[in-house]
Design a protein with these regions (language model features):
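Structural stabilizers in ordered domains
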Residues: 1-300
């Protein structure tokens, strides 16, 4: 799904523009072994990572600095009731995904209220050039739905976009606290992952947020920054880079995941307080790593 500049005013109304600007570019590679070693130290009883140095958590400050998602506003509380969701989706974006085929004599399983990412991309990847404002709004809405379902509210499978996140975008100017929702969702996904409550044992939530939080604070699995691609803010302060730009392009992990996991686990076990960066978001040598760039004002 390619970003279209015609979507910008509608995305900006939702408060998602800085984050969309961030993830619409190439994001740094995920170090699976390092993330797994970190998740192993998550405890659902306290919703925190238990390390030798003490307990650590991802906070709303981290959400704001790394993603620039709004942390103030109305709580994003969406009903999970899926009755009539196909009709509602058709009214909102013009069509629902096709119903799954059932073989003759087969039992029709309960269909989840979501749409495959492949279906979304096949039908809404490109907004026609001669589209009127209403059509552009529809494509912008679907684009945001696609992006946040793959990033903020990823479920670990990478297959479907839940209907409730599209429903949350019915009105653009709802002033939702997307940052609070992102953090709560990440906590829940970490709870599920450390309990291995899903069939695949995977993890969802905003892995970009978790990865950069870890790189900023812990030396375990921290990559080297190789370069910074040009950032085009189009003269709009809201589109300036977030703190995540420090890690725009990082070195790739070359070793085998299983071997790295053991190494990272041992490093986590021996981590000292002196090795932890307790206050990463401050002026000074850390900030200069990104060649001194103007930070998005929403992060401050």
């Amino acid at each position: 799904m390619q970003y279209d500049e015609r979507y910008t005013p509608y995305i900006e109304m939702t408060g998602l523009l800085p984050f969309i600007q961030l993830v619409s570019r190439s994001t740094p590679n995920l170090n699976v072994a390092a993330v797994t070693a970190l998740i192993d130290r998550w405890r659902p009883e306290t919703h925190s990572f238990h390390l030798r140095t003490g307990e650590m958590i991802v906070t709303l400050q981290d959400v704001s600095m790394i993603t620039a998602l709004p942390i103030e506003g109305k709580p994003l509380c969406m009903s999970t009731d899926s009755e009539g969701w196909r009709q509602q989706m058709e009214a909102l974006i013009g069509m629902p995904p096709p119903e799954p085929e059932v073989e003759d004599g087969g039992k029709k399983d309960r269909v989840p209220a979501d749409a495959p990412f492949t279906w979304i991309a096949a039908n809404f990847a490109h907004c026609p050039e001669d589209s009127n404002d209403e059509v552009i709004q529809t494509y912008a809405r679907v684009y945001m739905w696609y992006v946040i379902s793959r990033t903020i509210f990823a479920d670990g499978t990478g297959k479907n976009a839940p209907w409730m996140w599209l429903k949350a975008l019915t009105v653009f100017d709802n002033k939702f606290s997307w940052g609070s929702a992102a953090l709560a969702y990440l906590y829940r996904q970490l709870d599920d992952a450390c309990r291995r409550s899903t069939k695949d044992g995977g993890v969802g939530g905003c892995m970009l947020l978790l990865s950069i939080w870890s790189w900023e604070r812990l030396p375990v699995g921290r990559p080297k920054t190789s370069k910074w691609n040009t950032w085009d803010d189009n003269g709009n302060p809201v589109r300036l880079p977030t703190w995540a730009y420090k890690w725009d392009v990082v070195s790739e992990v070359a070793s085998k995941v299983n071997l790295l996991y053991k190494q990272y686990t041992n490093k986590m076990d021996s981590l000292t307080a002196e090795q932890v960066e307790w206050q990463p978001y401050c002026a000074g040598p850390n900030f200069g790593d990104a060649h001194t760039f103007e930070l998005n004002p929403i992060c401050l």
